């Protein structure tokens, strides 16, 4: 009997010890989130992406390529040359190509048609160098012109619906030696890696926050990342084959995220740790 009482007392003591830190942990979590939010506000003041956007606007207006033409007649979906609000409505179906295109793939179409810059030249260029660096700067300019706009991706066309379903399948597809998918990190509420919260991209709130804040400047490596680069890095982390730049794979994933985030607000370029 004495042993039983002692065991029960010990169990209660251990239980109390285990339960007590829960409240402290909750307090610590709230304080941590508040501190991170304050940090993000501070680093967002004077986003370095603004410098790239200024260069991108100049590149948009400057004649270039074999045809020595600017991109000022590029139709991003709202009419030739209209940049304001265009990124908030991408990806979208374009009748002139018969395809669904995101921002980068549409820009490659314009570069090829207007300037004579071959699409493959952009695809083959290393990240943040050559034609891809030019692309990054132009992307920074265009998404800046949609900052504060509502995410408004038109899903009415059948090809957009097809892309959404393809993107959804890819999002949940497990691959690589670690056997995980996009959903492993971004398919549940309340997940994080170290200090980084992971938005649930299957729900509106998470998709709006995730999609609506990319492209972004990454403070940790002092680099501007487009959505194409961000998605490629996800594949790299899966230790699987990275998709071709501007391929249907990345466009489909973008359609899935953007459609889930419809109605949210574009805060682009974002700024990340």
Swiss-Prot record:
A single Gene Ontology CC term: periplasmic space
GO biological process per UniProt: sulfur oxidation
Gene induction: By thiosulfate.
Residue ranges of coiled coil: none
Binding site for substrate: 230
Sorted UniProt keywords: Disulfide bond, Electron transport, Heme, Iron, Metal-binding, Periplasm, Signal, Transferase, Transport
Reaction it catalyzes: L-cysteinyl-[SoxY protein] + thiosulfate + 2 Fe(III)-[cytochrome c] = S-sulfosulfanyl-L-cysteinyl-[SoxY protein] + 2 Fe(II)-[cytochrome c] + 2 H(+); S-sulfanyl-L-cysteinyl-[SoxY protein] + thiosulfate + 2 Fe(III)-[cytochrome c] = S-(2-sulfodisulfanyl)-L-cysteinyl-[SoxY protein] + 2 Fe(II)-[cytochrome c] + 2 H(+)
GO molecular function, one term: iron ion binding
Enzyme Commission code: 2.8.5.2
Gene3D superfamilies cross-referenced by the UniProt entry: Cytochrome c-like domain
Binding partners and assembly: Heterodimer of SoxA and SoxX.
Protein name (database record): L-cysteine S-thiosulfotransferase subunit SoxA
Organism: Hydrogenophilus thermoluteolus (Pseudomonas hydrogenothermophila)
Taxonomic classification: Bacteria, Pseudomonadati, Pseudomonadota, Hydrogenophilia, Hydrogenophilales
């Amino acid at each position: 009997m004495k042993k039983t009482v002692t065991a029960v007392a010990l169990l209660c003591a251990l239980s109390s010890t285990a339960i007590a830190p829960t409240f402290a942990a909750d307090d610590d979590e709230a304080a941590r989130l508040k501190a991170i939010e304050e940090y993000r506000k501070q680093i967002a003041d004077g986003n370095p992406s603004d410098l790239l956007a200024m260069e991108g606007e100049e590149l948009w207006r400057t004649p270039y390529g074999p045809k020595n033409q600017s991109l000022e007649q590029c139709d991003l979906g709202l009419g030739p040359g209209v940049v304001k609000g265009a990124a908030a409505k991408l990806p979208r179906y374009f009748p002139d190509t018969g395809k669904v295109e995101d921002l980068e793939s549409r820009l490659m179409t314009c570069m090829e048609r207007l300037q004579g810059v071959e699409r493959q030249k952009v695809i083959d260029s290393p990240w943040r160098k050559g034609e891809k660096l030019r692309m990054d700067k132009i992307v920074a300019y265009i998404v800046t012109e949609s900052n504060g706009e509502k995410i408004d991706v038109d899903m009415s066309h059948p090809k957009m619906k097809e892309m959404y379903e393809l993107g959804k399948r890819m999002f949940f597809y497990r691959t690589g030696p670690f056997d995980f998918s996009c959903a492993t990190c971004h398919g549940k509420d309340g997940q994080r890696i170290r200090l980084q919260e992971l938005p649930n991209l299957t729900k509106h709130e998470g998709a709006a926050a995730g999609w609506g804040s990319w492209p972004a400047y990454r403070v940790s490596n002092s680099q501007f990342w487009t959505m194409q680069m961000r998605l490629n890095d996800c594949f790299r982390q899966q230790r699987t084959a990275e998709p071709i730049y501007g391929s249907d794979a990345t466009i489909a994933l973008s359609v899935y995220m953007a459609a889930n985030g419809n109605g949210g607000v574009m805060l682009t370029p974002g700024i990340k740790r």
